[in-house]
A protein has these predicted regions:
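Catalytic cores of the polymerase beta-like nucleotidyltransferase superfamily
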Residues: 1-365, 372-373
């Protein structure tokens, strides 16, 4: 969200709620407030309505306002959302919720009960203290119910309001979010919180779509290599790729590679990141040799060869990305790059120290795909 759009939206909301009977009980909440405290423009706007049945009443109130549209409520979770027209055909989607507590008995992110509560209890059910901040829409006062959120923003520390073991059990995706925050926002995960990030049983129940979204955010950060290393170190990479999790230290035993397979894969990822690579290139860089640990041949001298690893890696990459529910267009582009990465490599003549167009003759029709990616 652009800074100007955010400011327009907040000012318009202030005007709209002037005749709302619980206007003093409306707060900006979560990542929105965290970003403001950090001096950054929020990416989205979330509201907390600290009033009985606040979500439903607020949505009903907004239905009388021409600037608001697209109303949706989720009664079970006591949440809702709407679109705010800030002018010049610009609309911003805003989510709203009441303070709530949840109980989990049937697995992560499937609360058995959701009950309205007060802001303090709401704050302690959230993922991290830095996200448990509330800014009064009208007065601008910032509430820090955990007593740690403002300090954690200042010191860029990530810790959970409750015992991290319970916080991660309630929603194990928070473990991936912690690693993502460390990569994208340069937060340091507190020692206690970090020690509880692990391959807990609840992690197996997470949907692949949710894992994909966090994995993508990690991969698209400038510190993606660090993020992948953390995922492997905490035994969380297996939901993405078991081969990667189990074989990160695989020795290639080949005169062309002085790095382990894992070191090489991460080095290639780091290289394309420096060039500002998009998602497809980053995925291809990470998985271009993914099948090497399971398709090598032992030569007479004891060294390894990897004939056909490009084709096998392409097959495995398709399985990985399909399992993660990536769009077909993304999968096809990544698989093409992985399958042909040895051919692309041959465009460079190492003996003469220059690029040659000869291999392009074999891939003329596909070359535009490489350039588009």
């Amino acid at each position: 969200m652009k800074k100007n759009d955010y400011e327009k939206a907040v000012e318009l909301l202030k005007e709209i709620v002037q005749d709302c009977k619980f206007k003093e009980k409306i707060y900006l909440v979560g990542g929105c407030v965290r970003d403001l405290v950090l001096g950054k423009t929020p990416k989205d706007i979330d509201l907390c309505i600290d009033y009985p049945e606040g979500t439903d009443l607020f949505i009903d109130f907004l239905k009388t306002k021409p600037e608001c549209s697209g109303f949706v409520t989720y009664n079970r979770f006591k949440t809702g959302k709407f679109s705010l027209d800030i002018g010049t055909n610009e609309k911003i989607d805003i989510e709203c919720v009441v303070p709530r507590i949840e109980t989990y008995n049937q697995g992560p992110r499937r609360p058995d009960t959701v009950q309205q509560t007060n802001i303090t209890e709401d704050a302690f059910r959230r993922d991290f203290c830095c996200n448990a901040l509330y800014k009064n829409l009208l007065t601008g006062e910032v509430l820090d119910p955990t007593g740690k959120g403002l300090d954690d923003c200042k010191n860029r520390v990530l810790r959970t309001p409750l015992d991290p073991e319970q916080t991660f059990k309630d929603d194990p995706l928070r473990m991936l979010r912690a690693i993502r925050f460390a990569c994208t926002k340069m937060f340091t995960i507190s020692e206690e919180t970090y020690s509880k990030i692990d391959n807990i049983p609840e992690y197996s129940a997470l949907s692949m779509e949710r894992i994909r979204d966090e994995f993508t955010k990690i991969l698209m950060s400038k510190n993606a290599v660090r993020g992948i290393i953390e995922l492997i170190g905490k035994c969380l990479m297996w939901r993405i790729s078991k081969i990667f999790q189990l074989n990160i230290g695989f020795v290639q035993n080949n005169k062309y590679h002085d790095k382990t397979w894992g070191e090489h894969s991460l080095a290639v990822l780091g290289h394309v990141i420096q060039g500002g690579a998009n998602l497809e290139l980053r995925l291809a860089a990470l998985f271009h040799d993914v099948s090497k640990p399971i398709c090598y041949q032992v030569k007479e001298d004891g060294s390894f060869s990897f004939h056909g690893h490009d084709k096998e890696s392409a097959k495995e990459t398709r399985k990985i990305l399909t399992n993660l529910k990536y769009p077909g267009e993304v999968i096809d582009k990544v698989v093409f790059l992985v399958e042909n990465h040895m051919c692309i490599k041959q465009l460079y003549d190492y003996s003469r120290g220059l690029y040659t167009g000869k291999p392009c003759l074999l891939y003329t029709s596909e070359l535009p795909t490489i350039l588009r990616v």
